[in-house]
Swiss-Prot record:
Residues 54-217 form the SIS domain. This is N-acetylmuramic acid 6-phosphate etherase. The gene is murQ. A lyase-type mechanism (elimination/hydration) is suggested for the cleavage of the lactyl ether bond of MurNAc 6-phosphate, with the formation of an alpha,beta-unsaturated aldehyde intermediate with (E)-stereochemistry, followed by the syn addition of water to give product. HAMAP family: MurQ. The keyword Phosphoprotein does not apply. Gene3D superfamilies: 1.10.8.1080, Glucose-6-phosphate isomerase like protein, domain 1. The keyword Lyase applies. Homodimer. Disulfide bonds: none annotated. Pathway: Amino-sugar metabolism; N-acetylmuramate degradation.
Length: 294
């Protein structure tokens, strides 16, 4: 029942929200937001287990699939679409599904989140298999669409995890790993796009970033698999080569072009003074880890 969920409780500190000045509203929001990172901190060990599972999927050429409804679904898609430009993944490696389909990203699709079978259909459409990891996201922890997706994922042998913002969440029963970030009452009762949404975004940031580090997408703290899809990213790529090698901007640019815009290869070429082909071989042998290739 909704009344039993902490995310649905009224916040005692904001009972007079409609009487507050604009500044008081903003201060209240800021004060509540400060509690979110601390709530996430309590779930670090569980998040670590999720990351380890995702890395295993990636190593077996499996995928990371997010499923959610409303804000939760949008956050999953947001995290997924940032992976190709940031980490050089293809658009299948990390995917996000929202109840009601992509049109629900910009406009609510009434009733979609209440249908378990829609998630099964979505996951069947991509040929979900035992190598994949499915993460169900629901602030309330009770969304039928997410439960349906997790049930189907388990039936095909995929790894499963859940992210919710209530303890003992219903979706936790259908996932092997559970991240339950208890964010408590919102300043605006039941508006889980606020603290709960912030917590979900923090957890998703952790999962995707740490997992990509785990499969060699990062060298030191540089995103060396960045895709140069626009002018800003071309410049960033060159600067990454400068930072990683200590070379001048001109030398970095030269090797960036020699390496056919492959930042990892350019770094290896500069530091080992080798040709492009040799750099690629070293990276292949090192399974994409620049440090091992060196």
């Amino acid at each position: 029942m909704l009344e039993n969920l902490s995310t649905e409780h009224r916040n005692e500190k904001t009972m007079n929200l409609d009487e507050m000045s604009i500044k008081e509203v903003l201060q209240s929001m800021n004060e509540e937001d400060r509690t979110v990172a601390l709530a996430v901190e309590k779930e670090i060990e569980q998040i670590e287990k999720v990351v380890q599972t995702v890395i295993k999927s990636f190593e077996e050429e499996g995928r990371l699939i997010y499923i959610g409804a409303g804000t939760s679904g949008r956050l999953g898609i947001l995290d997924a679409v940032e992976c190709p430009p940031t980490f050089g993944t293809d658009d299948k490696m990390v995917q996000g599904f929202i109840a009601g389909g992509l049109k629900a990203f910009t406009k609510a699709v009434e009733g979609a989140e209440d249908r378990e079978e829609l998630a099964e259909e979505d996951l069947k459409s991509i040929g979900l298999n035992e190598k994949d990891t499915v993460i169900g996201i629901a602030a309330s922890g009770r969304t039928p669409y997410v439960i349906g997706g997790l049930k189907y994922a388990q039936s095909v042998g995929a790894s499963t995890a859940s992210i919710s913002c209530n303890k003992n969440a219903e979706i936790s029963k259908y996932a092997k790993l559970n991240v339950e970030v208890e964010t408590g009452a919102e300043i605006l009762t039941g508006s889980t796009r606020l603290k709960a949404g912030t917590a979900q975004k923090l957890v998703l940031n952790m999962i995707s970033t740490a997992s990509m580090i785990g499969v060699g997408k990062v060298y030191k703290n540089l995103m060396v698999d960045v895709q140069s899809t626009n002018e800003k990213l071309v410049e960033r790529s060159k600067r990454i080569i400068v930072e990683a090698t200590g070379a001048s901007y001109e030398v970095a640019t030269e090797y960036y072009e020699k390496a056919e815009r492959n930042v990892k290869a350019a770094i290896v070429m500069v530091l080992l003074q080798c040709e492009y082909g040799e750099a690629l071989e070293k990276l292949k042998y090192a399974k994409g880890f620049v440090k091992k290739a060196l």
